[in-house]
Regions:
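A polyanion-binding, active-site-adjacent surface
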Residues: 1-191
Length: 191
């Protein structure tokens, strides 16, 4: 095996082990860990709280379609919960917000170029976790992750929404969410 291929294989294995360890501790993730976009959800629905797939319902279907429409490949879909699931880390209580250091560890392990915060709970945790980087943003509303504004945080584009799943039942709200999401197309996309 070529040295470069061996290095890639070793890096892939190290990433897999890091993500497996986070999941074993109680961090909930679904999808492609190498996706350029990560969708973060904090307000889980009944199915998700009962252990169902994260973004496995109508919200996930709509988000997959939205991501595809703005240029992401179908496999470019990764979801991260800002609340803990079942795990072996006694510091993580299922259903409770992840500690900031664990959330940061998970997001840095995924290392996306874009982050979509789907609800207020996700935005609150992002704001608390990355306060050190957000304070450097000149515009106060952007630094506070006001819904609809794209913030550049440690080389990532971050966009907060204020309740994507709840907006699905209201045509105007759904259109507003779509207008926001269109700002977060893939880096280098020609549109």
């Amino acid at each position: 095996m070529h040295a470069s291929a061996q290095m890639k294989k070793a890096a892939l294995e190290a990433t897999r082990q890091e993500l497996d360890a986070l999941c074993a501790r109680g961090v909930r993730m679904e999808g492609n860990a190498f996706s350029p976009i990560v969708l973060i959800k904090g307000e889980l629905n009944d199915e998700e709280r009962a252990g169902g797939a994260l973004l496995g319902g109508a919200d996930g279907t709509a988000l997959r379609a939205s991501c595809a429409a703005i240029g992401y490949a179908p496999e470019d879909f990764c979801a991260l919960a800002s609340v803990a699931g079942q795990g072996d880390d006694p510091a993580l209580e299922a259903g409770k917000t992840l500690p900031t250091e664990v959330f940061r560890e998970a997001l840095e392990a995924l290392d996306p170029e874009a982050v979509l915060l789907l609800d207020t709970a996700a935005a609150d945790l992002m704001r608390e976790t990355y306060a050190d980087a957000l304070v450097a943003i000149d515009d106060f509303a952007t630094a506070m992750l006001k819904p609809g504004l794209v913030a550049h945080v440690l080389g990532r584009r971050v966009l907060a929404l204020d309740g994507f799943e709840a907006a699905l039942g209201d045509k105007r709200e759904k259109q507003r969410m779509w207008a926001y999401i269109k700002q977060l197309g893939p880096a280098g996309a020609p549109y």
